[in-house]
Amino acid sequence: WDAMEGGIRVPFVIAGPKIKAGIESKVPITFSDLLPTIADLAGYTKPFGDEIDGGSFKEILYNRSSRTINRATEGLIFHVPYANGIALKRAHSAIILDDFKLIKFHDNNQLMLFNLSKDLEEKNNLAFTHPDKLNALEKGLDAYLTKVKAPKWEPGITWKNKPIEKINSFH
């Protein structure tokens, strides 16, 4: 997978008690939201703190008017610390905050910025026309990767045939 919308924007289907059939939501969720949601649905009430990036989307499942997920991190962050041979073919990270998405390539620090509300296909790179937004998102992304000691890209590392300790050189 990669952090382009075609790699991360996929349908999610869930069923269960008190969840009405046929509801739809445009609120984005990530894999990190599953544990808090399942725990919330099961009645777990202790806070996870900032050890878990995700948040519960139970209220979205129960109430179509709910539009937010309370997460420990601001925005949605994706990290691909290796060359994967898929669309982008290079190690990269991304942050989505509100309508904007920043993609940062780790081999040369190239930045791409998209307004997803107007350009879901990610064809119009706004990196040169929105420098303030670009810088703010890059700062937030870099701070997060450092905070969580995200695996750092090294030349020659791919997702195949490498021991995990070779991939895990941290920020």
Question: Language model features by range: what are they?
Answer:
Residues 22-23, 69-72, 123, 153-156:
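Short, hydrophobic secondary-structure boundary micro-motifs
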Residues 2-3, 20-21, 27, 32-35, ...:
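C-terminal cap/loop subdomain of S1 sulfatases and analogous C-terminal strand-loop tails that border
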Residues 15-16, 78-80, 153:
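Tryptophan-centered motif/residue detector
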Residues 1-19, 30, 170-171:
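Histidine-centered active-site microenvironments of extracellular/periplasmic hydrolases
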Residues 12-13, 49, 60, 155, ...:
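Residues at secondary-structure transition points
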Residues 34, 108-110, 116, 121-171:
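Long, internal low-complexity/basic segments
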